[in-house]
């Protein structure tokens, strides 16, 4: 017979049945991420960093529960059920807290219907809601950025909105991509690459090469959420055009296979060019500086028009024939009424190796884009990937610690494949990256300041 659970019961002593029930509550909507970032060391520092969270996340691909693995690991520190329940209540996961210690959950929460209980803290703190697909009206700046029709509801679908994009049939897109040929484009086929939410194929429309992204449901992404991201991408691109944002040409939504059609970027992604994929030559330092400045221009345009990208990374920075940077993938973008506003979301999204500490807690703020851009600047300097499990340190952003501890210098990490790197400008870009990567969001510069730092670097 199992012993009753008490606040002093060790987490490591929970039986498999209880762990399975906990994972049923905590695994969905990535509640385990919220729990992981809430767990602290005795010193008050975070116990789990981005790399740890990536490892837990990878377990989903093998069919394992990240919640169970997280509790197995944390359980080695002699933490108790009481400790766990305190954190579950803190992050508003009341159902699993009640499962463990019913009396530990506030009576006001338990007495509410389930839907209200899940959102009880909204009356007292920041709103925690599912990502909406609305786009806030935005002022016109130097480049075209028109607000959506205010007479239409925010949650309208793209089929009923005036998007100004061409509507392709899925049959047309099959035709222009050779039936979505899976052979790599580098080998004469059509497949160009794979992203977080779909596969990109090369196509040809009226003698013009285009890129067709066929969206596909990934682990933990439902069909409904994929449709929301599809709608969001179109709405953002319909209202914002800028030389440093990728150009959306059209879409297809007449079948179960949602597709987006973009202008073709001959030089692929910054990630691929930094890794010299397919034997391409390394980017010069001059080109890297140009890419950094172009990306900063694009981020500034988004922020000044009240948009937070939420997934700035080298894979989402595309390069045209002149190596002009084009920010892509706006499916996770979020509209914010005020530039400095921080809101909360119940779903933590983005790429972990680039995510700011507050983003891992579910905060949505422009300063998280700044942090992610800091990682991109490190990639430009070093030519290294943001994360590599076979490297030490595994997270690229951790080189900042080594440099601050005077164990190494930025020269030790500068990409040796560059022949024109200027030590002074490399140091200046690293200084900008270091400021972007400050743990405290309010200590990071805004994007206008980052632009200034990058311009001074090239002066």
Curated annotation (Swiss-Prot):
Identification of the protein by name: Interleukin-1 receptor-associated kinase 4
Region entry Disordered, spans: 115-161
Domain Death: from-to ranges: 20-104
A GO-annotated cellular component: cell surface
N-acetylmethionine PTM positions: 1
Family statement: Belongs to the protein kinase superfamily. TKL Ser/Thr protein kinase family. Pelle subfamily.
Residues where ATP binds: 192-200, 213, 313-316, 329
Disruption of the gene: reported phenotype: Mice are strongly altered in their responses to viral and bacterial challenges due to a severe impairment of interleukin-1 and Toll-like receptor signaling pathways. Malt1 and Irak4 double knockout suggests an additional role of Irak4 in B-cell antigen receptor (BCR) mediated signaling pathway, since the double mutant inhibits B-cell proliferation.
Reactions performed catalytically: L-seryl-[protein] + ATP = O-phospho-L-seryl-[protein] + ADP + H(+); L-threonyl-[protein] + ATP = O-phospho-L-threonyl-[protein] + ADP + H(+)
Function comment: Serine/threonine-protein kinase that plays a critical role in initiating innate immune response against foreign pathogens. Involved in Toll-like receptor (TLR) and IL-1R signaling pathways. Is rapidly recruited by MYD88 to the receptor-signaling complex upon TLR activation to form the Myddosome together with IRAK2. Phosphorylates initially IRAK1, thus stimulating the kinase activity and intensive autophosphorylation of IRAK1. Phosphorylates E3 ubiquitin ligases Pellino proteins (PELI1, PELI2 and PELI3) to promote pellino-mediated polyubiquitination of IRAK1.
Modified residues (Phosphothreonine): 342, 345
């Amino acid at each position: 017979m199992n012993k009753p659970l008490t606040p002093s019961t060790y987490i490591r002593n929970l039986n498999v049945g209880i762990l399975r029930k906990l994972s049923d509550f905590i695994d969905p909507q990535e509640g385990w991420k919220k729990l992981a970032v809430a767990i602290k060391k005795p010193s008050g520092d975070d116990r789990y960093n981005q790399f740890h969270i990536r490892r837990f996340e990878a377990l989903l691909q093998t069919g394992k529960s990240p919640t169970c693995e997280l509790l197995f690991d944390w359980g080695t520190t002699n933490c108790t059920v009481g400790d766990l329940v305190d954190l579950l209540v803190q992050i508003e996961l009341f159902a699993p807290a009640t499962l463990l210690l019913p009396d530990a959950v506030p009576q006001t929460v338990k007495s509410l219907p389930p839907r209200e209980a899940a959102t009880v803290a909204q009356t007292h703190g920041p709103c925690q809601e599912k990502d909406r697909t609305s786009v806030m009206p935005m002022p016109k700046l130097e480049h075209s950025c028109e607000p959506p029709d205010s007479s239409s509801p925010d949650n309208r679908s793209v089929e009923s909105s005036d998007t100004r994009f061409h509507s392709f049939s899925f049959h047309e897109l099959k035709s222009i991509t050779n039936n979505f040929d899976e052979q790599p484009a580098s080998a004469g086929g059509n497949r160009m690459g794979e992203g977080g939410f779909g596969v990109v194929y090369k196509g040809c429309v009226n003698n013009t090469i285009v890129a067709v992204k066929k969206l596909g449901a990934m682990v933990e992404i439902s069909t409904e959420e994929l449709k929301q991201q599809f709608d969001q991408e179109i709405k953002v691109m319909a209202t914002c055009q800028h030389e440093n944002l990728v150009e959306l040409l059209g879409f297809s939504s007449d079948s179960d296979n949602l597709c987006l059609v973009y202008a073709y970027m001959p030089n692929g992604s910054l990630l691929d060019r930094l890794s010299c994929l397919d034997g391409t030559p390394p980017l010069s330092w001059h080109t890297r500086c140009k890419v950094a400045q172009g990306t900063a221009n694009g981020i500034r345009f988004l922020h000044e028009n009240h948009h937070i990208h939420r997934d700035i990374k080298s894979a989402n920075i595309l390069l045209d024939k002149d190596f002009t940077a084009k920010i892509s993938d706006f499916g996770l973008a979020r509209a914010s009424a005020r530039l400095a506003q921080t809101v909360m979301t119940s779903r933590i999204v983005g790429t972990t190796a680039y995510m700011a500490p507050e983003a891992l807690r579910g905060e949505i703020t422009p300063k998280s884009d700044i942090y992610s851009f800091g990682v991109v600047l490190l990639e430009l300097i070093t030519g290294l990937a943001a994360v590599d499990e076979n490297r030490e340190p595994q997270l690229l952003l951790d080189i900042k610690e080594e440099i601050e501890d005077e164990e190494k210098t930025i020269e030790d990490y500068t990409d040796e494949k560059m022949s024109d790197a200027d030590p002074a400008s490399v140091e200046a870009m690293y200084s900008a990256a270091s400021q972007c990567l400050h743990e405290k969001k309010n200590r990071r510069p805004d994007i206008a300041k980052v632009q200034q730092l990058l311009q001074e670097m090239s002066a």
